[in-house]
């Protein structure tokens, strides 16, 4: 029993001794490595030889793309590795110590920075420890939220593909002192973004020569290629704009008598202006290119503006004053003949017009009036007016070459017409009958003038209808062409629609 208990105590003592030796080896190794070590000295065996540094990065997330300020914000882990000639040891002399860690500033590390940084601190990395193994291989993995300047080309917005460059290089070492070598970027841990699709992040090593020095200055440039996802902008900007432009076509279908044609056109124009301001808020203030969506909005606003102008012309035609004159001949030929034939439009009541000589006109003379009046004494004004109107049954409508149709001309022979106009009749001794005939002539002239005014107004109203129908067809075709032509001019329009709207 005592022998077994003694064996247990010996095992515990050996374990504690091993732990204390392990800690002692690591402590002694740290003292040996940092003794006489200068963090400002480039750790190479031969000062004439460059120190090779392998550089790569791991892209975790595209956090934001600020189009207005042209800044790309990314979450990146940098990966740098090199061999430190002064940080090597024999593992047999320090058993169990495979690697050690040094904090920032205690050993040498390359001063690699993001050249096109837009951060206020410029260096946005979190300085972590440097991992060193027995062969002197050093590995430095600083994470950081990088803000880099990026030229945003908004020409094809919202169907655009952006390429933002991340240029890394040593800030103080040239190519003869530090040889920067590129490794492929890692995107295995990438977190997808709701606005952008990552298409790739290719890298390239460059060497640049400056006038001050003969040695090259290498840098590693990674190009973050990303495609904008258009579903959000399509639902919130493009589809409303298409619907608003379609509403602009309703201006030509709205009756002129409603009094709302101008109001509808102005309302649509103001709606497009509001959407234009929304796009201007997120776009950079640059004159290098006009965004695709701005081109579409501008063309739609031009269409709506022209529709308002045409609506003013239509309303002027529709409410034309008949005292302002008849329609010009060229206007009648173009609108009432050519355009109406092309649009398959007919004047209202054109098929119901009675031919000029459908009924044989009666000869109207005062003799017939006297015979009708001789049946009874003119004791009532109503009977006299009835006699007068019976004398006007010979009136009919006849077309005229200048204004289409003129109604109300008397179909009487010139002899009888002049006889009536001059008031010469057999019953000169009846003054009441003469007064009645004068009143009848006055009423007939008034009706004749009203008929002519109505014909003139109907011509102008029909011309307004023709202009409305013609502009409806023309503006519809132009709107469809602009919508398809402008939006489909984007290089990746089909790809964006197939991926985002599928």
Swiss-Prot record:
Catalysed reaction equations from the record: K(+)(in) = K(+)(out); Na(+)(in) = Na(+)(out); Ca(2+)(in) = Ca(2+)(out); choline(out) = choline(in)
Cited InterPro entries: Neur_chan_lig-bd (IPR006202), Neur_chan_lig-bd_sf (IPR036734), Neur_channel (IPR006201), Neuro-gated_channel_TM_sf (IPR036719), Neuro_actylchol_rec (IPR038050), Neurotrans-gated_channel_TM (IPR006029), Neurotransmitter_ion_chnl_CS (IPR018000), Nicotinic_acetylcholine_rcpt (IPR002394)
Keyword annotations from UniProtKB, A to Z: Calcium, Cell membrane, Disulfide bond, Glycoprotein, Ion channel, Ion transport, Ligand-gated ion channel, Membrane, Metal-binding, Postsynaptic cell membrane, Receptor, Signal, Synapse, Transmembrane, Transmembrane helix, Transport
Signal peptide: 1-22
Gene3D superfamilies found in the cross-reference section: Neurotransmitter-gated ion-channel ligand-binding domain (2.70.170.10), Neurotransmitter-gated ion-channel transmembrane domain (1.20.58.390)
Ranges in the topological domain labelled Cytoplasmic: 316-469
Protein name, UniProt field: Neuronal acetylcholine receptor subunit alpha-7
Lineage of origin: Eukaryota, Metazoa, Chordata, Craniata, Vertebrata
């Amino acid at each position: 029993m005592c022998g077994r208990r003694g064996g247990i105590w010996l095992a515990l003592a050996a374990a504690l001794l091993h732990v204390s030796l392990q800690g002692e080896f690591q402590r002694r190794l740290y003292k040996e490595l940092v003794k006489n070590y200068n963090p400002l000295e480039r750790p190479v065996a031969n000062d004439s030889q460059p120190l090779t540094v392998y550089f790569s990065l791991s892209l975790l997330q595209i956090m934001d793309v600020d189009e207005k300020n042209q800044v790309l914000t990314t979450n990146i882990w940098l990966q740098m590795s090199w061999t430190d000639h002064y940080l090597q040891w024999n593992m047999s002399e320090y058993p169990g110590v495979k690697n050690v860690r040094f904090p920032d500033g205690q050993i040498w590390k390359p001063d690699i920075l993001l050249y096109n940084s837009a951060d206020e601190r410029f260096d946005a990395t979190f300085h972590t420890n440097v991992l060193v193994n027995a062969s002197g291989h050093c590995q430095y993995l600083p994470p950081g939220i990088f803000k880099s300047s990026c030229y945003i080309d908004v020409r094809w917005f919202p169907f655009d593909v952006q390429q933002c460059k991340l240029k890394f290089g040593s800030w103080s070492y040239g190519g003869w002192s530090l040889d920067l070598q590129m490794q492929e970027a890692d995107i295995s841990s990438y977190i997808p973004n709701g606005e952008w699709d990552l298409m790739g992040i290719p890298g390239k090593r460059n060497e640049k020569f400056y006038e001050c020095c003969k040695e090259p200055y290498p840098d590693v440039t990674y190009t973050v290629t990303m495609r904008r996802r258009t579903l959000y902008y399509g639902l919130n900007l493009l589809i409303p704009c298409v619907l608003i432009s379609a509403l602009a076509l309703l201006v030509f279908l709205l009756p002129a008598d409603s009094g709302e044609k101008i109001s509808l056109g102005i309302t649509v124009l103001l709606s497009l202006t509001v959407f234009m301001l929304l796009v201007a808020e997120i776009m950079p203030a640059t004159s290098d290119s006009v965004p695709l969506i701005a081109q579409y909005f501008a063309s739609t606003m031009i269409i709506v503006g022209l529709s308002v102008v045409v609506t003013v012309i239509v309303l002027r035609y529709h409410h034309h004053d008949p005292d302002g004159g008849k329609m010009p001949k060229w206007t009648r030929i173009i609108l009432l003949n050519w355009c109406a034939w092309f649009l398959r439009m007919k004047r209202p009541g054109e098929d119901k017009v009675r031919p000029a000589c459908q009924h044989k006109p009666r000869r109207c003379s005062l003799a017939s009036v006297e015979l009708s009046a001789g049946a009874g004494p003119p004791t009532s004004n109503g009977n006299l007016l009835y006699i007068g109107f019976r004398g006007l049954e010979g009136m009919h409508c006849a077309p005229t070459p200048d204004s289409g149709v003129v109604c109300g001309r008397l179909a009487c022979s010139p002899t009888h017409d002049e006889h009536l106009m001059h008031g010469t009749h057999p019953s000169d001794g009846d003054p009441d009958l003469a007064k009645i005939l004068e009143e009848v002539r006055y009423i007939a002239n008034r009706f004749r003038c009203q008929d002519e005014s109505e014909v003139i107004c109907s011509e102008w109203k029909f011309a307004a209808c023709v202009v409305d129908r013609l502009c409806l067809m023309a503006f519809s075709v132009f709107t469809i062409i602009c919508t398809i032509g402008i939006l489909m001019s984007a290089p990746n329009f089909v790809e964006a629609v197939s991926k985002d709207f599928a």
